[in-house]
């Protein structure tokens, strides 16, 4: 046994459980924890971000890229509240994150007083965190720390992953506790076994089956296993936005992502499939539309495989069968069974028809933004990490990016927080140690622009692509549809919106920065895109809108902008309508 401070114990706990990097912002109530991080700097690194929100998003990116625990450390009061948005992001996107914030001395806490506040920068943090975490902890005694940290770590990873919160007073941080000479890693609970054979038989028996794949597959570390399963089943794959990077662009089984901001191809397939096997997706209304009867109207069976049975409280279709299972068991079981009966069924005519339809549709609904992201991602190496923001820049990215082997895309999917891509790129780059590409718009870029300093001072290999149309383009789409195109607070002409010179701003932070006016100009910067130093590219262009903008569930052939007659006729012929 040995004696060490609580702060030292917490840092050793992180090290024992494989955490290599933590993110945060120094403050009075966490000075002891930061001091301990400095003492252990040869075994763990701390990254001081430009704000607590930036640190929280960076921790999300780190956790998504590595599968490890993402740790955020902030001071009390405003430090904690600044990080709440990142905590909410982790909650909705099932990201394994732990937020630790300092708190005033236990003797200065409000306790049972009816006062608004007793200690300086005190806030009722636990009560505020509870709705957006799996569990919140209050370490008011030394004995809370050891058992509490163990339980918090298990809680993050058991079942559906998600964040936890720990509130720790400053006097507890510096107290001494006795512990074992060597801390051991927490063992994670293995998944319950499941037999997937019956569901695979049903898929093979269908005429037009598809797999609907979501971000949960990546969260479970099953990307390679999923690709193996697809190669065995040989059926089309439609993805959600978080699952968009699961299947390479050149795969014969890739259809594309679904939803109101998607291209039409996925909608056409969904409208005509007779069987859906949904893996790793909660099937949100953003994906399937708000009128569930319009979603997969011809399907005779929907099998939803979901680890969180509360998601089944929202029944989507009369034909659905709900399967509570961990994909870590379901996908290996499906692979094992598919290997035994390989060749017994042939859905290649269906696959070929889908590919022919995709080819016929490939030149439709293209904007400058689509062309830009298609060309930009074509220049990137395999295994590229791409972080996305919120707005039309995200739409262009998921619609038109070239997904190569190993490409990963990270976004704020459930919360949909602007300002995500740049700080998330910090965490992804730190965790993956390879060049990371942050795609953002002029609106989102300014939300967490301070993280350019984090990137610059650490010389992180982050390349930022700013799509500067001097407008909030995604909101303009809404204003066109519902508000007679009154562009209030979305353009400079509409009033109270202003963009800036991002290339000049990047240079001010010490980052190589370039203005791009033509897509082809990117070609001369291929070496910059692939080197290990930060860079910023600002592309100025006129707002080009978003196509086709069809609400989820509606027939994509008869809704949205009218398709050319030759394309419509070709699709109808190919799909046999």
Q: Where are the predicted features?
A:
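A structural motif corresponding to the C-terminal end of an alpha-helix
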Residues: 132, 274, 375-384, 506-511
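Active-site diphosphate/adenylate-binding microenvironment
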Residues: 7-20, 25-38, 351-433, 575
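Generic detector of well-ordered alpha-helical packing
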Residues: 53, 168, 307, 388-390, ...
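Thiamine diphosphate
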Residues: 100, 110-120, 315, 324, ...
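N-terminal alpha/beta PP-like core and its mobile active-site loop of ThDP/TPP-dependent enzymes
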Residues: 1-338, 379, 462-464
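Phosphate/pyrophosphate-binding active-site segments
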Residues: 1-2, 143, 299-392, 519-523, ...
């Amino acid at each position: 046994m040995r004696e060490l401070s609580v702060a030292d114990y917490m840092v050793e706990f992180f090290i024992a459980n494989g955490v290599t990097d933590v993110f945060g912002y120094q403050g009075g109530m966490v000075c002891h924890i930061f001091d301990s991080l400095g003492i252990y700097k040869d075994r763990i690194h701390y990254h001081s971000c430009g704000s607590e929100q930036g640190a929280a998003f960076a921790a999300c990116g780190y956790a998504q890229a590595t599968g490890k625990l993402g740790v955020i450390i902030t001071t009390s009061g405003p430090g904690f509240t600044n990080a709440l948005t990142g905590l909410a992001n982790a909650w909705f996107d099932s990201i394994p994150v732990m937020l630790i914030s300092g708190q005033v001395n236990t003797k200065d806490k409000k306790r049972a007083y009816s006062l608004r506040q007793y200690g300086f920068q005190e806030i009722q943090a636990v009560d505020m965190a509870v709705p957006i975490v799996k569990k919140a902890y209050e370490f008011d005694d030394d004995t809370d720390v050891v058992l509490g940290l163990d339980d918090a770590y298990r809680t993050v990873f058991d079942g559906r992953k998600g964040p936890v919160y720990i509130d720790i007073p400053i006097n507890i941080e510096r107290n001494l506790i006795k512990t074992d000479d060597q801390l051991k890693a927490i063992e994670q609970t293995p998944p319950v076994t499941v037999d997937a054979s019956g569901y695979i038989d049903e898929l093979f028996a269908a005429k037009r089956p598809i797999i609907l794949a979501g971000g949960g597959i990546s969260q479970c570390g099953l990307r390679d296993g999923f690709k193996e399963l697809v190669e065995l089943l040989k059926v089309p794959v439609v993805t959600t936005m978080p699952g968009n990077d699961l299947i390479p662009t050149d795969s014969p089984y890739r259809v594309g992502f679904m939803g109101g901001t998607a291209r039409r191809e996925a909608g056409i397939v969904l409208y005509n499939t007779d069987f859906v096997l949904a893996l790793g997706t909660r099937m949100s209304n953003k994906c399937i539309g708000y009128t569930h009867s319009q979603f997969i109207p011809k399907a005779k069976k929907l099998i939803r495989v979901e680890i969180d049975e509360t998601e089944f409280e929202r029944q989507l279709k009369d034909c659905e069968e709900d399967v509570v299972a961990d994909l870590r068991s379901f996908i290996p079981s499906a692979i094992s069974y598919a290997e035994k009966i390989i060749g017994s069924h042939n859905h290649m005519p269906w696959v070929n028809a889908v590919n022919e339809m995709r080819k016929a549709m490939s030149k439709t609904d293209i904007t400058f933004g689509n062309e830009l992201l298609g060309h930009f991602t074509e220049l990137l190496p395999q295994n590229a990490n791409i972080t996305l923001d919120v707005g039309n820049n995200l739409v262009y990215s998921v619609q038109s990016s070239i997904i190569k082997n190993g490409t990963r895309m990270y976004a704020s999917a459930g919360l949909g927080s602007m300002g995500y891509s740049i700080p998330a790129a910090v965490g992804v780059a730190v965790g993956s140690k390879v060049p990371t590409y942050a795609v953002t718009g002029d609106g989102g870029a300014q939300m967490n622009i301070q993280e350019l300093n984090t990137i610059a001072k650490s010389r992180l290999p982050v390349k930022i692509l700013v799509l500067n149309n001097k407008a909030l383009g995604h909101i303009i789409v809404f204003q066109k549809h519902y508000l007679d195109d009154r562009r209030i607070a979305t353009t400079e002409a509409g009033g109270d919106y202003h963009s800036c010179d991002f290339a000049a701003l990047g240079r001010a932070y010490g980052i190589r920065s370039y203005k791009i006016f033509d897509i082809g100009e990117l070609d001369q910067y291929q070496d910059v895109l692939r080197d290990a130093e930060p860079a910023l590219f600002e592309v100025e262009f006129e707002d080009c809108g978003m196509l086709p903008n069809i609400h989820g569930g509606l027939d994509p052939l008869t809704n949205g902008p009218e398709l050319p007659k030759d394309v419509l006729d070709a699709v109808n012929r190919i799909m046999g309508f």
